Amino acid sequence: MSRHSTSSVTETTAKNMLWGSELNQEKQTCTFRGQGEKKDSCKLLLSTICLGEKAKEEVNRVEVLSQEGRKPPITIATLKASVLPMVTVSGIELSPPVTFRLRTGSGPVFLSGLECYETSDLTWEDDEEEEEEEEEEDEDEDADISLEEIPVKQVKRVAPQKQMSIAKKKKVEKEEDETVVRPSPQDKSPWKKEKSTPRAKKPVTKK
């Protein structure tokens, strides 16, 4: 099995959490600041802004305030119950702190999205190699077990002397078959039989 030098690989993964807030006449602003020690790497992915079921028939405008008020507010949704009660927002990533404000209307307006935290995991290539080696060892063990379970059938071999005697016997039987000559139909004809039998000579009388 091949060995490789140890080296570290940093992988960046994202951990997402649901986020939501409400804007109404009593609470016209809300600020997202992130949570925990990872708030510096946090992003807010806004998804939907919608009116509540108790919203009045009036225009409700939601805007985002810039940090420290350096830039003018940006309107992200203008809602009305009978016309547009909900909007779907996509592709907006906001870095905390982010402040939302209900500029006009009494709401209630609900905002929802995802808190996205980036985390760095330090993984080692050796750990992956060890896992691969363990898998290969398991496969080898399974193959050995399967070979042990297969029954081995023993084949009986005939002794050389016995083989020679059998071959000799077959040869003798073949020679005997060749020596036996069967009479042909011509040998059975009466003419040939009479010709083959010699006639008796008549005695000659001396004068």
From Swiss-Prot:
Pfam families the UniProt entry points to: Nucleoplasmin
Biased composition range(s): Basic residues: 198-207
Principal location: nucleus
InterPro entries, alphabetized: Nucleoplasmin, Nucleoplasmin_core_dom, Nucleoplasmin_core_dom_sf
GO terms for cellular component: chromatin; nucleoplasm; nucleus
Residues marked Interaction between pentamers (site): E57, L84
Polar residues: bias regions: 1-15
Nucleus among keywords: yes
Tissue specificity field: Ovary specific.
Region (Acidic tract A2): 129-152
PANTHER family with a match to the protein in the record: NUCLEOPLASMIN, NUCLEOPLASMIN-2
UniProt note: domains: The acidic tract A2 mediates histone binding.
Family: Belongs to the nucleoplasmin family.
Assembly behavior: Homopentamer, when bound to H2A-H2B dimers only. Homodecamer of two stacked pentamers, when bound to H2A-H2B dimers and H3-H4 tetramers simultaneously.
Protein name: Nucleoplasmin-2
Organism of provenance: Mus musculus
Gene from which this protein is expressed: Npm2
